[in-house]
Design a protein with these regions (language model features):
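Charged, solvent-exposed interaction patches on well-folded alpha/beta domains
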Residues: 1-153
Length: 153
């Protein structure tokens, strides 16, 4: 008796594998017909953890009009997120990078989300290239172009 169990990948894992909804690594002989999926990466054995974080953080980011396209975890515990805007009325999707350490990762990502959702007077959101959230009391923001100085009357 032979049993066949269908596997539906939910994410790309590293360069040549896929992940099941449970975070199991799948090696597929032919994957040309698969739709574009999030790209996840991390040390061997970390696939379930990376997938869990992806789901958690993508849901948080979706709440402010952002989508998590790719997530990777380094061996030393740094998380790199590739994020894009999907806000209605935006001229185009804008990708940018977020970096956060394992230490207080949820708190620091939450701090970014609060700032992002509350403040766009200077149009800075459209200029984000990279944000480093590894600082205990703030974040470093790299912009594509410098903002124009605000003038007060």
């Amino acid at each position: 008796r032979v049993e066949v169990q269908e596997q539906r990948p939910v994410a790309k894992w590293q360069e040549k594998s896929w992940l099941s909804p449970q975070g199991e690594v799948l090696v597929l002989p032919h994957s040309g017909g698969l739709k574009v999926m999030p790209k996840l990466n991390g040390p061997d054995g970390m696939a379930p953890t990376v997938l869990s974080r992806f789901r958690q953080w993508n849901q948080l980011l979706n709440g402010v009009g952002l989508a998590l396209n790719a997530l990777s975890r380094t061996a030393v515990g740094t998380w790199n997120l590739n994020v894009s805007s999907f806000q209605i009325g935006a001229e185009q999707d804008r990708d940018f990078e977020l970096t956060v350490s394992e230490v207080e990762a949820d708190f620091r990502l939450g701090r970014f989300i609060r700032l992002y959702s509350q403040n766009n007077e200077e149009g800075w959101r459209q200029q984000i290239r990279r944000i480093d959230l590894r600082y205990p009391n703030g974040m470093a923001v790299a912009l594509n172009q410098p903002l124009k100085p605000s003038t007060t009357e």
